[in-house]
């Protein structure tokens, strides 16, 4: 029975499609979904200039898109067991097409944010349908130490290519072309689904016991927290009434979530996710810290490249290539580390990822000068890419091994809320406030008037503080993995 379940096949394909290319077709479709988005950050300055947005408005679109992906994780298997693979992929593809058409022309922000959430849901559902159907092709034993590195290779490659393509279209004069490219790719996906795939499903489980209200509350809480952290500096934090109102709504939303979590028979996120698994809470705390540190990419790095070095959009996009190489290297190292070298633990992979992150931060600290060749940035950006992939894979595999299957996707939802949305928002808010503080201090104490020098000093100072955080994380990991701790007996009270 177990051999039959673990035998790889793709019965949803029509007979004329060769079996050897079937998984590659689904890998292509997964890449098409991962390339999609609702607002593309590559041509950020061009979008701001054309639409009259603030930088915070575009970042909020990204956070809403990520929030839609994160909050949908508990529904992935429920939808898989309710609808056929072709139905879900077709619906996801059509949704991506419609949202890309609308977001290319809509400027009303609340509606734009809602469309970003919907696109995120379609994106993750389509990707999951493809990757879950070819999992046995990647690893016949469903070994997550194999699957997660391959999955991150696909996802991180798509993120890098999306940034490069959208920046190129912005560079040649029309950022909307990226939307048309995604629409064209999804039309190809629909053509493949129409001609090569038929409806097939093992079971037909009704969508009973789904806490839809709970799902909406979790999504609302993420949007409120992202708004607070994204727009906090713009509205002068708690000196303005807007932040007070949103904070009040966030507290009310959190209270409603906790009430439903403890009183609903089938809550969207079970309280057992937080109480019944030993390592879940440390993993969630650590991912917030690491994502806050990685937020340097969106604030310090962008300020340095644009304000200090005067790089344009296309020059910045060319710097994505060393990041992509680092991503691939990090995935390869993680695969070898966890799969082939069994004596190395996840904690030691975390130490390696933290070393990569520390090397990125320290190298950037010494490179922050008003005059710098672009080639000098390749090495630190490689380190950043390797650090991100190593740490993401390590945390995800650790979470998988810490939880049972019933609660894993709920835990994965919380993990990605913090990983993709909240952690990065906290980091960006901290760095934005830090830049303002140190820029004002440079003018006040050192009487510096040159804007490039002021920004370089501010960025350099913040990179220095982040280096101390990386050192503290590295020491913490090494102490956790020390022989005296691993070999001592557990206390008995």
PLM features: residue spans?
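Helix-loop-helix hairpins in multi-pass membrane proteins, especially solute transporters
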Residues: 76-212
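12-transmembrane solute porter fold
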Residues: 20-36, 41, 268-438, 462-471, ...
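Transmembrane-helix exit segments and adjacent C-terminal regions of multi-pass membrane proteins
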Residues: 2-7, 11-12, 448-493
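Helix-to-loop junctions at the C-terminal end of transmembrane segments
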Residues: 71-85, 170, 330-346
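Helix-breaking motifs and short loop linkers at transmembrane-helix boundaries and internal kinks
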Residues: 52, 84, 102-111, 310, ...
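Extracytoplasmic
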Residues: 5-8, 17-76, 126-127, 131, ...
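Residue-level signature of mid-helix packing/kink "hotspots" within the transmembrane helices
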Residues: 38, 66-74, 159-160, 324-332
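Hydrophobic transmembrane-helix bundles of small-molecule transporters
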Residues: 171-284
